[in-house]
Amino acid sequence: MNGTEGLNFYVPFSNKTGVVRSPFEYPQYYLAEPWQFSVLAAYMFLLIVLGFPINFLTLYVTVQHKKLRTPLNYILLNLAVANLFMVFGGFTTTLYTSLHAYFVFGPTGCNLEGFFATLGGEIALWSLVVLAIERYVVVCKPMSNFRFGENHAIMGLALTWIMAMACAAAPLVGWSRYIPEGMQCSCGIDYYTSRQEVNNESFVIYMFVVHFTIPLVIIFFCYGQLVFTVKEAAAQQQESATTQKAEKEVTRMVIIMVVAFLICWVPYASVAFYIFTHQGSDFGPIFMTIPSFFAKSSSIYNPVIYIMMNKQFRNCMLTTLCCGRNPLGDDEASTTASKTETSQVAPA
């Protein structure tokens, strides 16, 4: 084995020279230079500085403006809540541990940080599944004139949290475990060892199949059908021009969210899968650290995409920030842009 396994950790560094120490007790400067840990800390600080205000503003603006409290927006707000969990439960912890170059909070802190990071990522993924299904049902109309209402949104929210908890909570109750990964300053699922005592291999397979592959298959199926339907409707002029435009804008926004999710999480999932299928192989701490920390940026992109591509929300945000006045003079109440009949989201 080219790494060193302990009771509750796996360090990707051979202990032939006797330098490996527990990542819960000693700085890990034998894994990377001090400046590299400082870079990680600076990156986490940036995510906190950007992630908290963006996601908090998303929630606050929605509370302030009743017109934004629509069924589809419930799912988008769900992402903001999950991102705030990641910021406070994960990013602040990782910032502190990066400054010390080891996981100073011990195994319990590792469990909490790993839980919040996994929970946030899974809520984001299952929220995108719900959005994809909503777009498919509304635009493709497999169930005639189905209207995505408040009850459907609540059921969608429940699904995202149930599925996310089914994944993130399992290591806390003995199915797999959370351990420090990469440069040992953040925690995640144990992809590195078989760990028979906690049935680690079965959990990793379960996670990749149920909580990654199946959601992506659903998403790609829904959008494949959706693209075909939108093109067909446009060719046959089955919908009014304003309705088609609104549906296309909302669909484009959600598709961009999906693409952004893939960009952030596929590198991490790919590296994790490689490590899992090549346990004991030689790889350095940076190999897992970069995709792991890159995936954490997912807490920022969804609200940014939403703000940039949703004219109604953008105008409400400017009105809130500017004490009741929109400096662009584009009052949402007077805009003639049509909303989709189901999602009630105005096009950008």
UniProtKB/Swiss-Prot annotation:
GO terms for cellular component: membrane; photoreceptor disc membrane; photoreceptor inner segment membrane; photoreceptor outer segment membrane; plasma membrane. The modification N6-(retinylidene)lysine is found at K296. Disulfide bonds join C110-C187. One of its GO terms (biological process) is G protein-coupled opsin signaling pathway. One of its GO terms (molecular function) is metal ion binding. Residues 62-73, 134-152, 228-252, 307-348 are cytoplasmic. InterPro entries: GPCR_opsins, GPCR_Rhodpsn, GPCR_Rhodpsn_7TM, Opsin, Retinal_BS, Rhodopsin, Rhodopsin_N. The modification Phosphoserine is found at S334, S338, S343. The chain crosses the membrane at residues 37-61, 74-99, 112-133, 153-173, 203-227, 253-274, 287-306. Zn(2+) binds at E201, Q279. It is found in: Membrane; Cell projection, Cilium, Photoreceptor outer segment. Homodimer. May form a complex composed of RHO, GRK1 and RCVRN in a Ca(2+)-dependent manner; RCVRN prevents the interaction between GRK1 and RHO. Interacts with GRK1. Interacts (phosphorylated form) with SAG. Interacts with GNAT1. Interacts with GNAT3. SAG and G-proteins compete for a common binding site. Interacts with PRCD; the interaction promotes PRCD stability. Forms a complex with ASAP1 and ARF4. Forms a complex with ASAP1, RAB11A, Rabin8/RAB3IP, ARF4 and RAB11FIP3; the complex regulates Golgi-to-cilia rhodopsin/RHO transport in photoreceptors. Belongs to the G-protein coupled receptor 1 family. Opsin subfamily. Photoreceptor required for image-forming vision at low light intensity. Light-induced isomerization of 11-cis to all-trans retinal triggers a conformational change that activates signaling via G-proteins. Signaling mediates the activation of phospholipase C. Subsequent receptor phosphorylation mediates displacement of the bound G-protein alpha subunit by arrestin and terminates signaling. This is Rhodopsin. It comes from Tursiops truncatus. The lineage of its organism: Eukaryota, Metazoa, Chordata, Craniata, Vertebrata.
